Structures are given as C-alpha cells and as structure tokens.
Design a protein with these regions (language model features):
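PDZ/PDZ-like domain micro-motif
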Residues: 119-120, 175
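Conserved acetyl-CoA-binding loop-helix of GNAT-fold acetyltransferases
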Residues: 122-139, 154-162
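GNAT-family acyltransferases
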Residues: 1-118, 180-202
C-alpha cells in the first residue's frame, strides 16, 4: 500500500528497508538521542547485538507480512520515503490507556514519527507524513488522536503544537536522559486548530 503526499510517500515495509534500518541502529544513530533515548542508555554491546538480532528477525517477518497484504487491511504505521525513492523514516500508531500508558488493548490512538535520515530533516517531510497519516487514520474511523514525546525533544514539541496538538497530560520527571530529569508529555489533537493548520498549508 502506498499513499502519495506532497514530496513524500507513505508505504508498507519492504525487505530492502532492512539494510537501512540496520545502519540507523548501528552507525547513523544520532536520532536515538531524541527518540526515546532512555531505551538506549546503559545497554551493553552484548545486549545491543542480541536486540539487533531480534530486530532483524522481526523486520524479516514484517517484509513477509506486508508483501501480499491487501490495501483494505488497516495499517498501524507506514514507512516514509521521498518521491525519488529514498527511505528516510517511519510513522506509526499505538494505543494508550486513560493514564497515558501504552497498552496492548484497545485504547486512545497515539501517533509517533521518526526521521533518522539527517539529510531529510528541515524540509517539511515530517509535516507532510503526519498529515497523510492522520488523514489515513481518519478514513479508518479514528477521530481522537494523541501524540507522545518528552520535554527534551523540542523539535517534536514544536511540530506537535504547530499542527494543533494541545498538551493533554504531563508526567513530571518520569524520564532521565543523559543524567537530567525530563517530563513525559501527551498531546491531543485539537480538530479546529488542526483544520486551521491544514488551511494555512494550502
């Protein structure tokens, strides 16, 4: 499945994406300073390798699953590529409960985005991808949309607020990153502010 949106394309995961993902996990890792960095701190090389091996196995299963998946089967995320075909990142959705904790059960639809490819940043691709993804979720009947980040990720906060997300819940001091304490933030999309944002981009 593919969704064309401005300068980017949202598409399913492909087997050819695995090599780039491995690069992002092993050498081009700057993005990990901002995308849930607490998950990477204090992890030994042995643990990293074990996690990478499991990750590669997961990605192989993803590629197999999406290879023949009909377009009418709902997706919980997409890969992001430029119109020229360069793979630059991904966006996804997951559920949180009323306390803003991730849950495997049905809950509040929460979205996230990662663009590890540094050369692709600052070009508006994140906005285009999120607009397209929100549009897709709305087509699936999802009207109430949330977004989570942490108080040290100023770029993500700026994107969220500009798009019309309003702070919904702040959990003070629950994240420790590089020795400092940060808040966990949950935003909720304000439909009117989001509509105004979209009108301004036309």
């Amino acid at each position: 499945m593919t969704i064309e949106a401005g300068d980017i394309v949202l598409r399913d995961f492909l087997a050819q994406d695995i090599e780039k993902r491995i690069t992002w996990e092993t050498t081009e890792t700057e993005w990990q300073l901002w995308d849930a960095p607490w998950e990477y701190e204090g992890v030994s090389e042995e643990e990293r390798q074990r996690e990478l091996d499991g990750y590669i196995a997961d990605m192989q299963r993803w590629a197999e699953r999406f290879r023949d998946l009909p377009d009418d089967v709902p997706r919980m995320g997409f890969q992001i590529a430029t119109r020229a075909g360069e793979y630059i990142g991904w966006c996804n959705a997951y559920h949180i409960d009323k306390d803003c904790i991730i849950t495997p059960e049905e809950g509040l639809c929460t979205i996230g985005i990662s663009i590890p490819e540094r050369s692709a940043r600052g070009k508006g691709y994140a906005y285009q991808a999120l607009i397209a993804f929100i549009g897709y979720l709305r087509q699936q009947g999802v009207d109430d949309i949330y977004l989570q980040t942490w108080s040290g990720n100023e770029r993500m906060i700026h994107i969220a607020q500009k798009m019309g997300f309003a702070e919904h819940r702040r959990k003070t001091g629950i994240r420790t990153v590089r020795g400092k304490s940060y808040d966990g933030l949950t935003f909720r999309l304000d439909p009117e502010r989001y509509a105004a944002f979209c009108r301004e981009r036309r």
